[in-house]
């Protein structure tokens, strides 16, 4: 890859060629691009310059580890492209110092643009429990899940929404009709709130700092999904709980219906519900007891989710946070997976990640250290399966042979193996999160496998 000065030099050379050309854009040039040059108007650029801008943005990103977390590739390229406009329009293209001038001004513009990425809060409707009564906000790091009427009250209190708009939204949620607003912007914002929350009884909000809009939004969505997965860890079968915990932007209630024909028979299409519209129902005061019991889990997972949305990743325990972040993400994907064989692969990825990718022996060491099982201990009360055999089955047949395309069991029923994987993975993840909270000064992932 060419150096920074070489790339900027090639851009300046192309601009000089464009100025000297009599027929730009010619028949073979296509429609030229424009770069905003601020007070100096805009610059006409060709495909070669666009390619050089892409190369320049990749080089700048490669040399800036913080930017790789803060920006999506598209956002970073757009920012680099925009930063080039004013200096390129202001220099003398024949000045031997032009390259250095552009380089310095681009870096200065990038720093200024990044400093403007302040605090943002992203929100989306979600399902959780069947009733919102007596449910206090659930806080897991930067994520807050609250009943939509609580969220609306908070938006008014924090002056993020006007009282008139909030009153109209409550009326709409109660089934009332709304007259059109005179102010077009207020009308659009009101419609946005109603669309984004939808019929969901809860709202999931995520606060970010130092992230640009699109990257911040994507990280907020990821953190939201992970927070729901953490909440599902409180149930014996997390995937069933998570089926009723869902962001509105994800798939909604689904009724699976298939029409089947058999020779000589009249058959009717059966149906099965998935992506349920809500989760569990709690009696009055019951969730408060559960929330108190889950507070240590939410505190530990909160540190991990803070790492997910952190602008630079420079936190006190980056190594352990990174391992646990990936484990929670794999766990979420495993619970959501519709195909049993693929779910097994993802559940085992949770175990393998917690074991730092060191395979079957270290997964056994992890379960011994955190769960307390010896190799020959039975994992079920019935005594039908030893821990070492369970791990061998999951890692060998369930994970490795499937990933490498050598499994001869994909056409068989994997529901039992999925059940086994869903027994071990959440248990290991829970115990690792507990250890993470209890050992607040530790940042060596290998210690997860030490008693």
Model-derived segments and their meaning:
Residues 1-61, 65, 70-78, 93-123, ...:
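Amphipathic alpha-helical interface elements
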Residues 73-342, 416-451:
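Charged, non-catalytic interaction/linker regions at domain boundaries
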Residues 310, 329, 377-380, 405:
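Short glycine/proline-rich turn/loop motifs
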Residues 346-347, 361-368, 412-421, 445:
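Composition- and surface-driven signal marking solvent-exposed, interaction-prone regions
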Residues 359, 400-407, 429-438:
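Charged/polar positions within long, soluble alpha-helices
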Residues 369-382, 451:
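Short, mixed-charge aromatic SLiMs
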Residues 371, 377-378, 394-398, 433:
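S-adenosyl-L-methionine
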Residues 384-415:
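Histidine-centered, metal-coordinating catalytic motifs and their short helical/loop contexts
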């Amino acid at each position: 890859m060419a150096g920074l000065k070489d790339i900027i030099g090639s851009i300046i050379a192309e601009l000089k060629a464009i100025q000297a050309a009599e027929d730009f854009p010619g028949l073979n040039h296509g429609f030229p691009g424009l770069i905003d040059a601020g007070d100096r108007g805009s610059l006409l650029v060709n495909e070669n310059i666009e390619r050089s801008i892409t190369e320049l943005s990749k080089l700048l990103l490669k040399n800036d580890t913080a930017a790789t977390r803060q920006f999506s590739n598209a956002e970073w390229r757009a920012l680099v492209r925009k930063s080039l406009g004013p200096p390129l329009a202001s220099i003398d293209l024949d000045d031997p110092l032009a390259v250095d001038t552009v380089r310095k001004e681009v870096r200065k513009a990038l720093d200024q643009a990044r400093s403007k990425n302040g605090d943002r809060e992203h929100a989306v409707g979600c399902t959780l429990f069947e009733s919102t009564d007596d449910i206090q906000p659930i806080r897991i790091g930067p994520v807050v899940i609250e009943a939509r009427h609580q969220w609306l009250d908070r938006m008014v209190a924090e002056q993020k929404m006007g009282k008139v708009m909030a009153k109209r939204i409550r009326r709409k949620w109660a089934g009332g009709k709304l007259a059109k607003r005179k102010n077009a912007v207020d009308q659009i914002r009101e419609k946005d709130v109603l669309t984004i929350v939808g019929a969901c009884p809860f709202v999931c909000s995520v606060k970010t700092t130092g992230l640009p809009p699109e990257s911040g939004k994507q990280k907020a969505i990821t953190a939201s999904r992970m927070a729901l997965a953490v909440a599902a860890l409180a149930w014996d079968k997390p995937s069933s709980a998570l089926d009723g915990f869902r962001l509105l932007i994800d798939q909604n209630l689904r009724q699976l219906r298939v029409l089947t024909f058999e020779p000589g028979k009249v058959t009717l299409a059966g149906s099965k519900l998935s992506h349920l519209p809500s989760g569990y129902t709690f009696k009055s005061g019951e969730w408060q007891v559960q929330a108190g019991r889950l507070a240590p889990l939410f505190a530990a997972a909160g540190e991990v989710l803070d790492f997910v949305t952190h602008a630079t990743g420079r936190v006190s325990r980056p190594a352990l946070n990174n391992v646990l972040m990936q484990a929670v993400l794999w766990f979420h994907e495993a619970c959501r997976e519709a195909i049993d064989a693929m779910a097994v692969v993802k559940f085992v990825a949770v175990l393998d990640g917690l074991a730092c990718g060191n395979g079957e022996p270290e997964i056994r060491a992890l379960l011994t250290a955190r769960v307390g099982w010896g190799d020959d201990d039975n994992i079920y009360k019935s005594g039908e399966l030893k821990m070492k055999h369970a791990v061998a089955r999951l890692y060998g047949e369930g994970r490795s042979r499937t990933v490498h395309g050598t499994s001869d069991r994909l056409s068989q029923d994997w529901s039992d193996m999925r059940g086994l994987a869903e027994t071990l993975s959440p248990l290991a993840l829970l115990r690792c999160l507990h250890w993470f909270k209890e050992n607040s000064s530790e940042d060596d992932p290998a210690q997860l496998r030490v008693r």
